[in-house]
Each structure stands twice: as structure tokens, then as C-alpha cells.
Design a protein with these regions (language model features):
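Extracytoplasmic/secreted proteins, especially bacterial periplasmic and envelope-associated proteins
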Residues: 62, 66, 79, 83, ...
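Aromatic- and charge-enriched surface segment that lines or borders ligand/interaction sites
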Residues: 86-128
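Short, low-complexity disordered leader/linker segments with a strong preference
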Residues: 1-35, 49, 79, 123, ...
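Short, well-ordered beta-strand elements
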Residues: 31-43, 95-99, 117-120, 147-149, ...
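Surface-exposed binding/hinge segments that line
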Residues: 89, 132-178, 186-194
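Residue-level signal for nonpolar/aromatic packing positions in well-ordered secondary structure
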Residues: 15, 37, 71, 87-88, ...
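N-terminal lobe/hinge region of extracytoplasmic solute-binding protein
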Residues: 38-91, 183-185
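Extracytoplasmic
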Residues: 30-32, 66, 83-85, 91-93, ...
Length: 197
């Protein structure tokens, strides 16, 4: 009985010492930070033929790869917050006024203003199967950094839909849709898109 207790105590002590030894930090903290810059490869079996957010569900790739951003985004608590839009308001019916962030440029170098966003949303409505029915956009007017959208019927969820990945704002003029490459406002630029690699 005494031997069992001694063995149990010795085993417990060994476990505690092993745990404490594993928690130690032998490397000194130099305060230096390392930044590695290079190619970023994501999804080693890439099935996306394009990162054009206005084609099928490729808006997810556009955001995931850091190429594009939307006018609004969702917080962790699923509330809308500004991203490329600075603010927005609705007259309670069909007219929305969206004020855009200043000093945002596309990877092409073009300034993101209301005219560029209007052109982008027109391209979205012409090419995406869900966007026209979701957004119900009937008309848009652009002036400086202010975009006015009129919907065909009241649509209180308009900003939610513009936060969908298909709503990534891209420079339509600088995008190469044949190669599947778009110019967005995100921190990364597409150089080449290789599918099924």
C-alpha cells in the first residue's frame, strides 16, 4: 500500500514537472518583428476561373484574396459598418444616399468616386444573376463622392445586399474580364490567375 502511494506521488510529481518545463520560454524576446513578402498562394486546387465578383459566387474569392472590398461589411455581431462607404441614409422609401470614403484608389490608380462606383454597380446588375432582384436598383446618380440610388420599390435591405461579396467595388475600365482579373480597392493586386493547378 505504501509503495502504491509512493509510486502514485512520484508519477504525479513527474507530470507536474513535465508541464512546468513545457511552459518555459528559452528564446529571448528581441522586440524585432519579421515581415515576409512574397507570393501568396491560396486554395492549392483553385477552381475559380475568375476573381470577378460579378460572376457567379466569385465575390468570395475577390474578398478572401484581399483584392476587393464592399461599400459596407458585417461586424462580428452581424451589424453593418462602413467600409468603402463613409455613411448612408434612406429617405424611408426608395431613395438611398451613400457618401463614399475619400482618398481611396483602385489598384489601377483610379480614384474611387461615385462615378466609378456607379459604373461598377451597373456592371454588377448586367452580369450577376441575383443582384438585380436582390437590390432592386432602378436608377443611380453620381456626384463627387455621393452616390444616389433609387430602387424600384422600397428595399430596406439594400445596404445588406451591397455588403454581399458580389458587391465588391472594382474598376470596370481597368479589369481584364477575359483573363478573370479585376482591379479592386483591396491591399492585393492580381498578377496572374491559374485555375486547376
Amino acid at each position: 500500500m505504501r509503495e502504491k502511494r509512493a509510486l502514485l506521488l512520484l508519477t504525479a510529481l513527474s507530470l507536474v514537472l513535465t508541464l512546468l518545463a513545457g511552459c518555459g520560454n528559452t528564446a529571448p524576446d528581441t522586440g524585432e518583428k519579421t515581415m515576409v513578402i512574397g507570393d501568396t498562394t491560396f486554395n492549392s486546387e483553385n477552381w475559380e476561373e475568375t476573381v470577378d465578383p460579378h460572376r457567379t459566387y466569385n465575390g468570395w474569392a475577390c474578398i478572401r484574396y484581399g483584392i476587393g472590398e464592399t461599400l459596407v461589411r458585417y461586424t462580428d455581431s452581424m451589424e453593418l459598418e462602413p467600409w468603402l462607404a463613409r455613411s448612408w441614409s434612406n429617405d424611408g422609401d426608395r431613395t438611398w444616399t451613400i457618401v463614399l470614403q475619400d482618398n481611396v484608389t483602385f489598384s489601377s490608380g483610379r480614384k474611387m468616386d461615385a462615378a466609378a462606383v456607379k459604373q461598377c454597380l451597373e456592371h454588377l446588375l448586367e452580369n450577376h444573376d441575383r443582384a438585380p432582384g436582390d437590390t432592386k436598383i432602378a436608377d443611380m446618380q453620381a456626384e463627387g463622392q455621393t452616390l444616389t440610388i433609387v430602387t424600384s420599390q422600397p428595399n430596406p435591405a439594400l445596404m445588406n445586399y451591397l455588403g454581399d461579396p458580389y458587391g465588391c467595388i472594382i474598376d470596370v475600365d481597368a479589369s481584364d474580364f477575359e483573363k478573370g482579373i479585376v482591379a479592386g480597392t483591396g491591399p492585393y493586386v492580381v498578377q496572374e490567375l491559374v485555375t486547376d493547378d
